[in-house]
Amino acid sequence: MFEVVKQGLEQKLPKELVAELLETYSETKNNYYLSKFRPNEVEGGRFAEAVFRILEVQAYGTYTPLGKQLGTEKLITNLQNIPFGKQSDSIRLHIPRTLRVIYDVRTKRDAAHLTDGIDPNSQDATFVMAACDWVMAELVRLFHSVSPQEAQNIVENIVERKLLVVQNFGGFLKTLNPSWGPKERLIATLCQCGKNGATVDELIS
């Protein structure tokens, strides 16, 4: 799924932004599944910064260099002031406002500053992960260069909840419960594959 997303986005966006987007998204997912909630929030912030730059490219044809401070408040205001019809509402309103909340969780909660004595928790991390999933789905819809059916399959697999007992090791799916028999392993693997399914050879291997 990631390779399809990568190839599609790179046809419309700078490669370094696509790489940053996918790296931070993947890290956020992995940290969430491992219950590393503090890194999850921080990576959610990095993900938001990558998407803010993608919005800059779409709206203005240029973007704030990676490593340079983003003026997110000004950017959000500028995007919402783009005349109706010149950009989609997702670019103007929905994605920026979602990123603002992700960014606030990252910068104003315990994950970034440790100022209010509140430990990061699963509630914050679950919100960040769901918001990142939604934003990724929107980006696929906006920038995909595949068929409509392929794009829909990609979106559905992005937002689909994955099983913690199945991990992907270099393209090889492995179930982590040693007490399971072949039937349980087969069912779990098929659930993890989602709507794309799996071939008989893939299941045997």
Identify the residue ranges that each predicted region occupies.
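Short helix-capping/hinge SLiMs at alpha-helix to coil transitions
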Residues: 37, 191-196
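Long, low-complexity, charged/polar intrinsically disordered regions in eukaryotic proteins
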Residues: 110-184
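Long, charged low-complexity segments
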Residues: 2-10, 27-29, 66-141
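Hydrophobic residues on short alpha-helical segments
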Residues: 183-191
